[in-house]
Amino acid sequence: LLSLSGYIEDSGLDDLKNFFEEKIFPTKNLIDQGDYKLNQLSNIGVLEIKSLLSAKMIYAHEAGIDVTIDIPDRVDGFSIDTVDLARVLGIFLDNAIEAALETEQPQMGLNILQNQAGVSIIISNRFLDNGAGLHKLKQKGFSTKTGHQGIGLSNAQKIIRSYDHVLLETTIQCGCFIQHMELAARKE
């Protein structure tokens, strides 16, 4: 978006059109060809979240990760602030991508399920188990990655704790790291 705004502010419409055709349109063509399993993202009715998920899943696929996306029903809203949700999802997806790339068979999945109780978001990825317990991974300052500050998951936890109707369950099963977030529907 920043690059688009730069073209709009500094350049003419022709430059913006060229940028779109060279950088953005090829991605659309790849999606249309079915190389990516992104068609289910059309079920996300919140543009900011759909854009974030698209960008992360395209990046993961291009990095060589086997990506699975399952969003069977339309989701027109989430019961938390869009910016907060984008921050949490960005952290979870970045971590999932990095961890999956460390494995011999990188895989990750995104499931978003709408039901009467609210929305479930499940992000899973294969990872190399280095023996760090789940409680350590969530501590501020702890990172399994060299040169990282270890604040991502702790920041995500802080955001999630600020909502009394959002629950996060983190589990490890069969070589997969799973983040399962439940966003309960708000009572009106």
Spell out what each predicted region is.
Residues T103-A117:
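Short beta-strand/loop element within the Bergerat-fold HATPase_c
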Residues N155-L167:
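Conserved glycine-/histidine-rich ATP-lid loop and adjacent helix of the Bergerat-fold HATPase_c
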Residues N18-F25, N39-A63:
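Short beta-to-alpha transition helix within the HATPase_c
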Residues L41-G45, V67-V88:
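Conserved short strand/loop->alpha-helix "switch" segment adjacent to the catalytic nucleotide/phosphoryl-transfer site
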Residues S3-E9, T82-P106, I159-S162:
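Conserved ATP-binding N-box helix of the HATPase_c
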Residues L1-K28:
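A conserved cytosolic signaling coiled-coil/coupling helix that links sensory/transmembrane modules
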Residues V119-G150:
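Glycine-rich/acidic phosphate-handling loop/turn and adjacent ATP-lid/helix
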Residues G150, I172-H180:
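Glycine-rich nucleotide-binding loop
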